Amino acid sequence: MAFMGIVARRSPPPGILAMTDTLHASHAAGSAISAHAHTDAASRDAALARRYGAEAVPPAGPWNATIAGLLDHRSVRGYRTNDTLPAGTLETLVAAAQSAATSSNLQTWSVVAVDDRAVRADLAKLANGQAHIEHCPLFLVFVADLSRNRRIGERGGATLAGLDYLETYLVAAIDAALAAQNAVIAAESLGLSTVYIGALRNDPARVAALLGLPPGAMGVFGLCVGRAADGAAGEVKPRLPQPAVLFRDRYAAGGEAELVAAYDPRMEAFSRRNEMSAARWTTRVIARLADAAALSGRDRLAAILRGLGFPLR
């Protein structure tokens, strides 16, 4: 109908309007998803290139923030001075650690948070003078601990002869490692940095004495946790190409020499950029494992463990 020269226009039915709005919203959402997927792909490719080198990036696969955080891991040996962590950080990390898998739910590990500065200084000294043990705001010693289960047996009138075997010690060491790695992942998700201290195994008996560990308990490694000092984080360290460690159905070392030869210069370049020893990775492997002396006292570990209450039958 026309009135005064103006043509009256009919409005679209409500259903058509709703459909149009839905299509516009779907298009916008699709564009956002596409952009997000593109960003994720770029993030994934960059992270894999940092970890393996651009020449050895494995095939693309699923990706999320958790995987991105894992690939961004690096050991940090410099921490902010006089720093403190938020209240509850220790307990949160231990909750994450206790959420790791544990063989048969035996829970054969414990952890000691070391605050005593004199004890930290002694631990740093036996660990080849690693000063970050003294300076980090949180230092943990993860313990392969069969003593708790031994006490459970004693209270129940059982001797638990199964605790005396190498297998059970191995379970405890693995439990401690799994727990610690969960703690590391949790710490890094909170923006904290970490470094493991395997050099505590230079003198496990001294570590046990310093921490008051009972027989059947051994400090397998330490862990520094804190906020990285400026410039301390460094780069992500390259790893061996996946075909050097990933096999399908059967172990196959046929192409290993070529893969390791390709990795050596990548690791050498990383070391030069980060002001480390420029020796090739293979050279370091040979030096680190050349003889008993290269183990810094750890060649006596079996005897020391027996002295700490692990018969290792």
For the regions a protein language model found, what residue spans apply to each?
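Acidic, surface-exposed loops and disordered segments
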Residues: 2-313
